[in-house]
Amino acid sequence: MNIEELRKLLKAGEWNDVEFKEARMEVPKSAFETISAFANTHGGRLVFGVAERGESYEITGVDHPDKMQNDFLSVLHADAKVNHDVQVTEQRMNLEGKIILIFQVAENHRMRKPVYLDGDIRRTFLRKGSGDYKAQMQDIERMLRDATADRWDSLPFEKVLLEEAFHPGSIRWYLDRFHQVNSGFDPKQPDQEFLYHWGYLLRDGRQYIPTNAAIMVFGSPLAVHQLIPRPTLDVQFLGYTADEPMPETRWIDRMICEDNIIQAWEQLLTKYRFFMPKPFRDIDPVTLGRRDDPPGFRVFREAAVNLLIHQDYGDHSRKAVIKFFRDGIQFWNPGDVFGDDSRLWEPGEKEVRNPSIAMAMRRIALCEQAGTGMRMMREEWQKLGHPEPFFRN
């Protein structure tokens, strides 16, 4: 950071990536809460030597910068203060004859979260707006789930009997599509053998145990409700634009799905085709069926299937929501991006929260291949004359 960048920060004030502390004589205890918050969220800059004066900020400087820096970093790196190492880069600046200390804090990798203080996981902080806030228990549980080497969707599910675990219609739908897309597999293979072959059943002695992925993709209503006590998807068709205030009648139609992913997709597709215009284009030369999907269907399908694949199903306090406004579509998903959100637009494989669910959808070509979907959605949507899609993590 140079002096001009620092002046811009002082003018803009505190926000989610910068925190000012007066810290003239000693390290404030709240500085470590900021370290936890930045490391658990998206990183940021912690600046010593700047005091808040009403709605503005005054450069006060640090009286003994060498001692202040050493005291702060030695406590930070002590085993008892934070539970995980945090990458901190220090910088010193002389502004208006006063010394300012700047600490650039990097976000920790998901395997090294949550970052908490004094050995107490309840002292986990998150950065929200211009403040540091104690994480709620559901936030802590989410970070712990994401930190484990075992993915949630690969864990065994044993809450119902195997013969009650699956929805036969969903398995048939999937197998029909699988054999259309993939040649060389035996269409007469028994269902259990197929599911075991692709890792959706685990063997325990002589019995099979389904995984969480198997239940989310193929599960019976009983099994799905035992696994996630909240809807899979909430779809709202709204009669106003995203910028308009909410009217007394909130929606034209609404669909709440509490079934598996395949059933959720089929129900969503029926609603989508009912509400969206369907101009006839031509005849499919293979199936001889009408090709009249709405414009932008490929983009919608990718966004919707991504919503079903990548949500944090272990979070029982929130649900995925699709809102059809008059001027756009909003997809809201529980859970932040599992990997590095700065690489979302790059080609190639990415870390995903639910790899078994993702592969199930890719095997039947219900979504784009790994590393291509985000760019496809952006390019195809703009080709149709729409603004570039807006993404927020």
Task: Identify the meaning behind each predicted range.
Residues 1-46, 50-102, 109-111:
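Polybasic/polar functional segments that serve as interface/processing modules
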Residues 19, 47-49, 101-104, 215-217, ...:
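Structured core elements
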Residues 25, 349-363:
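Short, hydrophobic/aliphatic alpha-helical segments
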Residues 29-32, 66-70, 297, 354, ...:
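Amphipathic alpha-helical transducer elements in NTP-driven molecular machines
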Residues 39-40, 93-94, 217, 323, ...:
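Well-ordered beta-strand positions
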Residues 83-163, 315-318, 364, 368-371, ...:
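Intrinsically disordered, low-complexity regulatory tails
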Residues 127-316, 324-325, 329, 335-351, ...:
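Active-site helix-to-loop segments that bind/position phosphate- or nucleotide-bearing substrates
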